[in-house]
Amino acid sequence: VPGDYVSDAGALLASAPPKDRVLWEYRIAAASLRAGRFDEARIQLDAAIPLIGGIIADSKDAARARSLFHPENAKVFIGEPYERSMAYYYRAILYWRDGQPDNARACYRTGEVINSDLENKQWQNHFALLDYLDGFASAKLGADGSGAYARAQAEAGAVRLPPYDPGANVLIFAEFGRGPRKIASGRYGERLMFQVQDSPAHDARLTVEGRAVPLRCWDDLNYQAATRGGRAMDYILGNKAVFKSTTNAVGDAALVGSAVAAGDLYRDNGEKSQGAENTAIALATVGILSKLTSAATAPQADTRTWENLPQRLSFAAARLPAGAHPATLEFLDSSGRPLPGETRTVLVRVDDPAHDTVIFLSEP
């Protein structure tokens, strides 16, 4: 099915308007990873990621993305912070698979920044796996990853993260569940909200060579979507909605003021007051301009969604000798019991124990 999705989505990408291309590249990349089509995933992410950076840094699309006078769904899609972070997370997996942990680490660090509270300059990422893998890549490269590990553990809460094992040669990335969906709400449809559905799969377990490798949930994208820097997000769309309400209020008040001033055009003796006339004209002009500004503002939330993201992410590192190792993958419910119909056999193939083998596992 993922392979069919890749083909169908590729056709849609070919005909997609420029504003939607990154969205389709995200979707195809995720589906390609699950289908084992790693070259295709790499192509799509390498097409999407430079555009993300370009829009954030400076371009005509950047100015448009900040504009208050363009409908949100008319802008070039780059996604919410959790979506952009996931693009870098997936790209890092491919870098590590290609024997480039240094580039993988750069991706993790970029994802951390994207997922931080930049507006208040708190620089506090709450994506535990990004921090953990940042430190793990450092440890593999012979550097000190203890700071990143400490951040990851603080973010993971009750989940006790394993200490780094630089000698581990099998890196297991797992994902399960269905990620968040976007909806619009509010008076003007300006509030971006998320529909979330808790996945029956809360954790996973890979049994290989008689050893059970736990794959506990480290990060929940439902939580990541609704927060930034560990706090409830205040989207830029919220500011636009306030702007629309404020300009409406200014416009109404100004028009009322012009009517009052017009009523005072004549003094009690019947003579025309030039000052009142000028005030009435000025207030009426402000009122009309405010109304026009408010009408031109389009604060509707952008509900375009990278809809094939998972809900939960996990990671484990192990040591295995060279060879093909049959393994059993189970997805577990909240009580730790295997979910019926979710168990399958996978083959872990280690070609060279001196180099890292990257395994990517996804719930069907």
Model-derived regions: residue spans:
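Start-of-helix signal in alpha-solenoid helical-repeat scaffolds, especially tetratricopeptide repeats
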Residues: D20-L23, I78-S85, H126-A128
